[in-house]
Amino acid sequence: GQVIATGQLQEMAEESVQNVSAIIKKFSDENISEKDIHIQFVQTGQQGVDGDSASITVATAVISALEDVGVSQDLAMTGSLSVRGDVLPVGGVTHKIEAAAKAGCKRVIIPQANEQDVMIEDEYEDMVEIIPVSHISEVLDVALEGEAETDSLVARLKNITGSALQDGSVAGPSSPSPQ
């Protein structure tokens, strides 16, 4: 099977989908080698998608669908994703948090590497909880609903990816994506 992404993706976004694909293929209990996974980016405008800041969101959505586990609906997230499962920094985090708050989201997952970049306006302080993460297993732990299922999925992912959480290592240096 293959991962097919549509919606006017630029080069960086296409690479991001490939990283997500690698994590999903490592992660899933199911044999997905004979399944095609379609990812459609909607409302991308004429410029399309040029960045990797939706990587953790795409990975969470696909894993949720494959494993039939719901995603919390009061949550927004942004972050790039390495093939090892590390959540990498992205640009524009403050703006994204404020937009999520305006849209009614109660929690926002961001890369831990971006935590010091956050300078949200006072009016948004009490509207959202900002949750910094460094690994996809942390994203899934927060985002997926159903405690027993989530615990099992997160434990499995930590085993498969050799989680930075277990060995104490941190993602290597990376420059934020433009999105």
Predicted segments with their positions:
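Peripheral, non-AAA+ core regions of ATP-driven protein-machinery
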Residues: 1-179
